[in-house]
């Protein structure tokens, strides 16, 4: 497997899990390559422009600091599968921020969004449409991944 995109120590540790039979079909490099393409489109619809960049560099940055956050004793106790799950969590934690043109065009046909919008407008009547939808996406980030 070409692992040139997998630069962090966490990713290198996660690769060892792919030697286990239940994970042999998983390709971290392919996942990261595809995710890199997808995450580069988060701002395409004009949303999240004031947020920090949430492309693959954001994920790489988080993976770089994880080594400093996890105590050495914990790192030694973690299995390769633990590292794999951690890396996958980092990879997909902001995936729900991606909004397609179709989704944005159909937002006013989305009952949960309309309810969210109504409730937020009651509290903050001056909130513009972009900020409303951006907040809706942010609040529902985890659910949007599935």
Features from the language model and the residues they span:
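Divalent metal-dependent catalytic cores for phosphoryl transfer on phosphate-bearing substrates
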Residues: 76, 81-146
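Residue-identity detector for threonine
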Residues: 3, 33, 49-52, 74, ...
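Alpha-helical phosphate/pyrophosphate-handling elements in metalloenzyme active cores
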Residues: 48-85
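Context-gated lysine
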Residues: 7, 16, 32-34, 43, ...
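Generic detection of long, well-ordered alpha-helical segments
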Residues: 25, 56-59, 135-139
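Active-site flanking loop/helix segments enriched in acidic
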Residues: 36-61, 128-132
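Basic/hydrophobic alpha-helical interface regions
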Residues: 2-47, 63-67
């Amino acid at each position: 497997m070409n692992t040139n995109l997998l630069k962090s120590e966490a990713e290198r540790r996660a690769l060892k899990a792919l030697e286990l039979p239940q994970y042999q079909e998983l390709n971290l490099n392919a996942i990261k390559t595809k995710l890199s393409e997808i995450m580069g489109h988060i701002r395409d619809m004009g949303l999240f422009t004031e947020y920090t960049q949430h492309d693959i560099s954001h994920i790489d940055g988080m993976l770089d600091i994880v080594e400093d956050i996890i105590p050495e004793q914990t790192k030694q106790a973690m299995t390769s599968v633990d590292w794999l799950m951690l890396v996958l969590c980092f990879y997909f934690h902001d995936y729900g921020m991606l909004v397609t043109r179709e989704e944005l065009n159909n937002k006013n046909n989305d009952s949960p969004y309309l309810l969210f919008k109504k409730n937020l407008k009651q509290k903050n009547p001056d909130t513009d449409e972009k900020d409303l939808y951006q907040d809706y996406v942010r609040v529902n980030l985890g659910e949007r991944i599935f």
